[in-house]
Amino acid sequence: RPDLEDEEGDKKEWVELEAKPPSYPKPGNLIPVDVSAASSNRFFIDPDSISVGGDGVVRYTLVIRSPAGAENVSYEGIRCETREQKYYAFGRRDGSWSSARSGAWRWIEYKEINRQHGVLYLDYFCPDKKRPVGPPPVIIRRLKYGVPARD
């Protein structure tokens, strides 16, 4: 993991903050996110779950809905500085969370299929590829009004 520089320019090791899943998303609060015409799935972010940690990680709940109505719910993080994504927990039908088995960070690819993380990283959360675009209200506004952060 890359080290960070403090205000004096000294290197310090990056430390990930603990991430606890938020309240389960309410269907009426979800913000649709346009990911790709190549996918028949629909993607949503729960605005109440968005946080920007002191560790530079944007955490959020992603809901993926298939055309048949099946849903996958996951609590995730994107680390802007390293272009990585991580799963913290997965939603259950009863509204509870199950911790992810692997706590590994994964490189975010921007490809035609399964590109939701690439879209969130480049268009909404980390346009400069170094740090989050702003606090949760800025991210929420951009998601709601379809304004990518690259404008």
Identify what each model region corresponds to.
Residues R1-D151:
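N-terminal secretory-pathway/extracellular module detecting exported/lumenal segments
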